[in-house]
Amino acid sequence: ADFRRTNNDASNTPSVWQNIAADCEIDFCLATVSPNGTATTGITRTSTSQTSFSIGSDNVKSSSSGGVDPWPQDDYLNIWVCDLSGGILGYATPPSSWPNPNDGVVIGYRYFGNTGVVQAPYNKGRTATHEVGHWLNLDHIWGDSNCGNDQCNDTPVQQSSNYGCPNFPSTSNCTGNGSNGDMFMNYMDYTNDACMNMFTNDQKSRMIAAINQYRPNLLNHNLCSGSTNPTSWDCIGSGCVDPGTGNGAYSSYNACFAACECSGNIYQLSEGFH
């Protein structure tokens, strides 16, 4: 929903930015065909003795270190849901690093989806939205520096990241910030899930360019069709995983998504979770 601007809170975008709030024309669906050609739900569950995983080691992405190996990254978006240490909500590999054997997105299970054990204020699936944005070449909206550049001309310059749920307008001491202040409701800021509700047109352009340049294979297969010779695409807008445990060991989850290009320039990426 977030990438199609069909999210229920889209109307919360301030009126001054409604005209640049984008339908990114990117749909996500769980893969229904596995790498070996068999039917799949697009979700795998792996019981492991590893109690947590870290961004530094990236060990969730390898079966040899207690995680699970990815499905072929040129055909699937892999999302690992696990117990992520260090207070990190999630992380992603940018497309500029492609080809990368660790390509994909990792989300802490407490911040994934919107039901079950998910914890407020990150309980509406926006961690996945944010990290998939990075996976599709979006920078943080503050440009990761004081009054930095996020490479998108239609986002205001802002001094740093925002947290919580600021009141609009919330201004920064930056040239180019303007009377409307920070676009803190943008998915690429750090505000609470309930306060995020938009991508911009320039962010949309960057994401579609990233698909075409770095991830074109996602558009040229039938892995989210439910059939190896599909006549239609079966896509869903949301999903969640219940991170249970097995025999006292934490269970990690890997969701695999594929993609196809549909009429009207809509990009369907078969997603793992969100």
Where are these regions (language model features)?
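Active-site-proximal segment of zinc-dependent metalloprotease catalytic domains
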Residues: G56-G143
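Propeptide-to-catalytic entry region of secreted or membrane-anchored zinc metalloproteases
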Residues: A1-Q73
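The catalytic-center signature of Zn2+-dependent metalloproteases
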Residues: Q119-N197
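Pan-zinc metallopeptidase signature
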Residues: M196-G226
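Sec-exported extracytoplasmic/periplasmic mature domains
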Residues: A1-N8, H134-I141, N212, P216, ...
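Primarily marks secretory-pathway-exposed extracellular/lumenal segments that are disulfide-
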Residues: L223-H274
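Stable alpha-helical elements in mature extracytoplasmic
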Residues: K124-A128, Q203, A210, S252
